[in-house]
Amino acid sequence: MLTIAALGVLPWTTAAARECESTLGRGWPPAVGNYGTAVTTLLDGGTKPALSLLTLPTRGVESAVSLVPGKEGADWTLRHSRADERVYSWVSQTDRGSVQFRTQQTPETVEIPIPAALAKRLVSNWTNTLTQLAPNGRTAPVSEGEVLSFQVDGVRYSGARPSCGAGELLLKQAALLIEASEGKEKKRDKRWTQIESSLDELQQTLAGTAG
């Protein structure tokens, strides 16, 4: 981890840059916006998340994990949504094909409470991380495969799946959120503790002190 710890903060060596280049940029990748927006609208279900991670796979159904603010001082809501059938559909015709979005469906959604303090820390840490991985002026790159799209406080960051450094830690935290939503209630406190530990590691990584 030492060679990738300086992600976005300390001057990179050439070797470190090669080892862990950011795959993310601002907004949607070219030609993905309409698809991504359709899936987001379906999976958000009228909520307004402060943080979300949308997965647009090359095959299979689309999914999202998100945090929705609660009322003053109350727990937030952790949502994990999955399309019932793949939204993106290629329809072959005699002389050409066309894309259709299957949005007339009801996604599978699980909602559980998450402590407000932890949710706010996730929003803050993800904002700091994503603004370093995808600074202003860096647009989301062209993608022909799976697209991951983060949205935090109204700003979208998209690209290929991060496989190292701070980006990989965000995915670890998202996976723990999903585990919390799918697991037993008695195991949630353990998941929250694991997320807190991962956030500590994320802060160390960004500060260049992870070892």
Could you describe each region identified by the protein language model?
Residues 2-11:
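Bacterial N-terminal signal peptides
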Residues 17-211:
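Function-determining sites in protein domains
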